[in-house]
A protein has these predicted regions:
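Juxtamembrane interface at the cytosolic side of transmembrane helices
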Residues: 1-15, 131-180, 287-312
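Extracytoplasmic/ectodomain regions of membrane proteins and secreted proteins
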Residues: 12-133, 174-292
Length: 312
């Protein structure tokens, strides 16, 4: 009878823990984030951030003073000129001091999570997706329940089956390193909780839109207008920028690709926010522990059933 209770408990826990929703949510999130957490992706993201940071520094400390002098303005007058005539450039430059540390912190956090992510990515194994976990859990519960039912009719045979299945439920998670993987997944969950929010997604979208508009207006409107005022051709202006302001010149070429990569990362966060909300309350290490304890209990009850049947 107790064996049946354990089996029913495993099935009930699957439903109570919402594992049939958690499994797909976990798998979808892991699959979508996997490309963003490669070593190369992290290095590229750091390079993109460094490029934006260099533009911010160069614009305020070199480009503004130099262009102000060329146009016979003070730096303050030039900044006012930019704000009035190229508001998107002004807004973008104003957003960079906040956006750069935000994205740098986000990328650093993701980089730090890579070992935990790799471990969680192997739940239950590297070749089996997480969507198999709830089915395996329910299957184990039903099997244990049926074994308990059989033990009522044939204590010796049912007890032997309970002993074998119980030991499997105890040993297989250890063989698959599930306790460690589950603990890593829980730690990953805990580390992401402070940052993985709707506010993060909304702020990142807004910041990228502002910076993207800055790059577009700078390249298509501001620089051609400045070239006219400086009596330069567009080609001469590009040469002038490349020689004197290399970070800005390079950013004009690389910013579209950089922003596309950042937008792709933000899209991954946005698309998986509901998945994260689904799995966030679930403690996987606790569930694995319950499964193993249940296996040990079933094995013990099976052994007792065998001994009792022999005495009779």
């Amino acid at each position: 009878m107790l064996i049946m209770v354990v089996g029913a408990g495993l099935v009930a826990l699957t439903l109570i823990s919402n594992l049939f929703a958690v499994g797909p949510a976990f798998e979808n999130l892991i699959t979508d984030f996997r490309p963003a957490l490669t070593e190369q992706s992290i290095k590229t993201a750091h390079a993109d951030i460094a490029g934006l940071s260099a533009v911010q520094t160069e614009f305020s400390t070199k480009l503004v003073p130099a262009l102000s002098q060329q146009l016979k303005m003070t730096p303050e007058q030039f900044n006012g000129f930019v704000s009035q005539n190229f508001p998107k450039v002004a807004a973008g430059m104003g957003a960079l001091p906040t956006a750069i540390p935000t994205f740098d912190g986000l990328i650093n956090t993701l980089d730090q999570q890579r070992p935990l992510f790799a471990s969680a990515d192997a739940i239950p194994t590297e070749s089996l997706p997480a969507t198999t976990v709830p089915w395996a859990w329910v299957g184990a519960g039903i099997l244990v329940f049926l074994i308990g039912l059989a033990a009522l009719r044939s204590p010796k045979a049912g007890g032997a089956a309970a002993l074998v299945v119980g030991l499997l439920l105890l040993v297989v998670p250890l063989a698959l390193s599930l306790p460690g993987k589950a603990a890593d997944a829980d730690q990953l969950n805990a580390n992401l909780k402070p940052i993985y929010t709707q506010a993060l997604v909304d702020n990142a979208k807004g910041g990228l839109a502002t910076i993207g508009a800055m790059g577009t207006e700078m390249g298509t409107t501001m620089l051609p207008a400045l070239a006219t005022q400086l009596k330069m051709t567009p080609e001469q202006l590009q040469t002038f920028l490349g020689a004197n302001f290399p970070a800005t010149a390079q950013a004009l070429q690389t910013m579209p690709a950089s922003l596309e990569r950042f937008n792709g990362l933000v899209k991954v966060f946005d698309n998986n926010l509901s998945n994260y909300e689904t799995l966030k309350p679930v403690g996987l290490a606790r569930l694995i522990l319950i499964l193993m304890v249940s296996g040990g209990l079933v094995a013990a009850l099976g052994a007792v059933s065998i001994v009792t049947a022999r005495r009779e």
